[in-house]
Swiss-Prot record:
Entries under NCBIfam families matching the protein: PRK00283.1 (NF001399), recomb_XerA_Arch (NF040815), recomb_XerD (TIGR02225)
Organism listed in the record: Haemophilus ducreyi (strain 35000HP / ATCC 700724)
Family according to the record: Belongs to the 'phage' integrase family. XerD subfamily.
Protein name: Tyrosine recombinase XerD
Function: Site-specific tyrosine recombinase, which acts by catalyzing the cutting and rejoining of the recombining DNA molecules. The XerC-XerD complex is essential to convert dimers of the bacterial chromosome into monomers to permit their segregation at cell division. It also contributes to the segregational stability of plasmids.
Length: 297
């Protein structure tokens, strides 16, 4: 990883220590500050540059085709950075105070219909140990709305089949208990009884859904497995994302009248506004049904 200016490294260390940001967020900030540092003409020009200089930097990014969402993130990063510089007495003024974040276009998450989800869940062959594992994973994803990273990092100790719950360590190391339902419980038990020992052979693993090498599966590997089963189920790849079953979980709950705050708790969202996007998905679906079936639609 590229070594940055010691002041920038100090800033990133402070973020890690004081704000408990995720590894991916910290990495994004580091990459943004690498780009920013490369753009500066002189080393440590960030100690003297002005609001106008920052506008030129952001304008240069837009000219190169960066999206507004990317600009919004780097503005957020720069605001934190220059606030840090002021707090640590590296600067007296904050040139980001006048910056305006671009309006971020709301991206509706891609979701599947209930019929498509059933087709996807039915795609794995439960007679094959690997596909039985995948079947249990897909069922658990749809039953709980877990993030893929949360799913693949589950250990046996996180699961309580008798009580029908799974203990999840989410973003910011926040813990939540999520009910898993009868169908997912059944397939997890099937995997324990018939697939797991065959998959592991003589190896030992605490991972709930291990790879053939008894290790934790990677996000990329699981994403490839989802796409494989989607093809078998005849689902358009354009409708897919690694979190497709998480989105379906939330959308289908809201479609069936679930309280938004309950969905928020199940998903592990810290902010209700993050969950509210699924109400837009549900409304879009309702409008589509109305247009298709209402005589004056």
């Amino acid at each position: 990883m590229k070594k940055l200016d010691p002041i920038i490294e100090q800033f990133l260390d402070t973020l890690w220590l004081e704000q408990s940001l995720s590894h991916n967020t910290l990495l994004s900030y580091r990459l943004d500050l690498e780009l920013f540092s490369a753009w500066l003409v002189e080393p440590r020009a960030f100690l003297t540059l002005t609001h106008t200089d920052l506008q030129l930097f952001l304008g240069d990014r837009l000219d190169k085709g960066y999206k507004s969402s990317s600009s919004a993130r780097i503005i957020s990063c720069l605001r934190k950075f220059f606030r840090f510089l002021c707090l640590e007495k590296y600067r007296l003024d904050d040139p980001t105070s006048m910056l305006i974040s671009p309006r971020k276009r709301v991206q509706l998450p891609k979701s599947l219909s209930e019929e498509q989800v059933m087709d996807l869940l039915d795609a794995p062959n439960p007679l094959d140990p690997i596909e039985l594992r995948d079947k249990a994973m897909l069922e658990l994803l749809y039953a709980t709305g877990l993030r893929v990273t949360e799913l693949i990092s589950l250990t046996i100790d996180n699961l309580n089949l008798r009580q029908g719950v799974v203990r999840v360590i989410g973003k910011g190391d926040k813990e939540r208990l999520v009910p898993i339902g009868e169908e997912a419980s059944y397939w997890i038990q099937e995997f324990f009884d018939y697939g797991r020992m065959i998959l592991l052979s003589d190896q030992q693993s605490d991972v709930l859904f291990p790879s053939r090498r008894a290790k934790q599966m990677t996000r990329q590997t699981f994403w490839h497995r989802i796409k494989y089963y989607a093809i078998l189920a005849g689902i358009d790849a354009e409708k897919l994302s690694p979190h497709v079953l998480r989105h379906a979980f939330a959308t289908h709950l809201i479609n069936h009248g679930a309280d938004l705050r309950v969905v928020q708790m199940l998903l592990g969202h810290s902010d209700l506004s993050t969950t509210q996007i699924y109400t837009h998905v549900a409304k879009t679906r309702l409008k589509s049904i109305h247009k298709q079936f209402h005589p004056r639609g």
